[in-house]
From Swiss-Prot:
InterPro entries named in the record: Me_CoM_Rdtase_asu/bsu_C, Me_CoM_Rdtase_asu_N_sub2, Me_CoM_Rdtase_bsu, Me_CoM_Rdtase_bsu_C, Me_CoM_Rdtase_bsu_N, Me_CoM_Rdtase_Fd-like_fold
EC number: 2.8.4.1
Domain of life: Archaea
Protein name: Methyl-coenzyme M reductase II subunit beta
Species the sequence originates in: Methanothermobacter marburgensis (strain ATCC BAA-927 / DSM 2133 / JCM 14651 / NBRC 100331 / OCM 82 / Marburg) (Methanobacterium thermoautotrophicum)
Subunit and interaction comment: MCR is a hexamer of two alpha, two beta, and two gamma chains, forming a dimer of heterotrimers.
Amino acid sequence: MPMYEDRIDLYGADGKLLEEDVPLEAISPLKNPTIANLVSDVKRSVAVNLAGIEGSLRKAALGGKSNFIPGREVELPIVENAEAIAEKVKKLVQTSEDDDTNIRLINNGQQILVQVPTTRMGVAADYTVSALVTGAAVVQAIIDEFDVDMFDANAVKTAVMGRYPQTVDFTGANLSTLLGPPVLLEGLGYGLRNIMANHVVAITRKNTLNASALSSILEQTAMFETGDAVGAFERMHLLGLAYQGLNANNLLFDLVKENGKGTVGTVIASLVERAVEDGVVKVAREMNSGYKVYEPADWALWNAYAATGLLAATIVNVGAARAAQGVASTVLYYNDILEYETGLPGVDFGRAMGTAVGFSFFSHSIYGGGGPGIFHGNHVVTRHSKGFALPCVAAAMCLDAGTQMFSVEKTSGLIGSVYSEIDYFREPIVNVAKGAAEVKDQL
């Protein structure tokens, strides 16, 4: 029997019904098989850039930006022999013939997706085993395939794994993981939040609602890891994932469609009207001036509605400008206006608005060190909202028309090419709905 009475209808990115009368817990990371598979694949997947390795060796461009070692050039036809290398990597990585190791060639052998077996993940203390094992296997596979001698073997290692272990990360490497090294996390349990918005956008091929959905899934699943979504707060996070992330009851789609030619303010008006109609909030009292003070019938559901309105306002505002830079101020002033309009707390009970203050400063104010797309939930500036701010950033970068110095194409080309080949990464909304359909009658 479900723990919560909430039941939702799940709609797709096109506003069409996918699954109806779904228990809220069916979209929980603890119950939904699609989310479980997605998180597992995030941890065990590595993108290897064979074309990059070949180019690094040919130019002796090793260990990162501006590093060249004349005289150490090595000519190896790596892409041409991608299939043989992939087969060798598989034999080195797998633990048995029938395990779930997965090796996939992409772009005619220019890249490889390596998914290490869950048996290796199970005996590791953290998720970096996927990058370390894959890197070591690719190095050995190239050495074996081309009979590289002991004098050039270290160049192969550096072309594959970069400066590691001289650095704590893989600076200058030609392999990428979605999760950064644990030593760079802002706090315990922040691993799933350490995926920049541009990566999410590239993986979903700039589909706005799927990008915000994937971001929401990663952010809200992290809340279960950090202990935020436990006990009294679990329902709040599940409702946030359902409505803001997965377009429950088509609320997100309806708000965007209704305000296609509107503003942040009109989205707020639509949201409050919908919340009153659905019985989420009610007028507590009316002042002599006519100002209405609202009170929620359900605090957690109000937060989910407010978060959905926040994402809708971002889509409307940034979509009108076709420039992602406005996302920070949209997150800030949507909440500011919403609080004045209703007398109720903003999204995430103030944390989203607080996050936006710092986000505005560090993304384009006096400091302006980085565009919105390079931020993530593990960033010191944007970590403070408990899963409700970053989906807006992902949506904004989908709608950007090339205004950013840190564009999706520049920062996330390899990640997008490799991970977008996995359907539940590329289209999470429909696949999570399928997962919910599998388990809803078992709850």
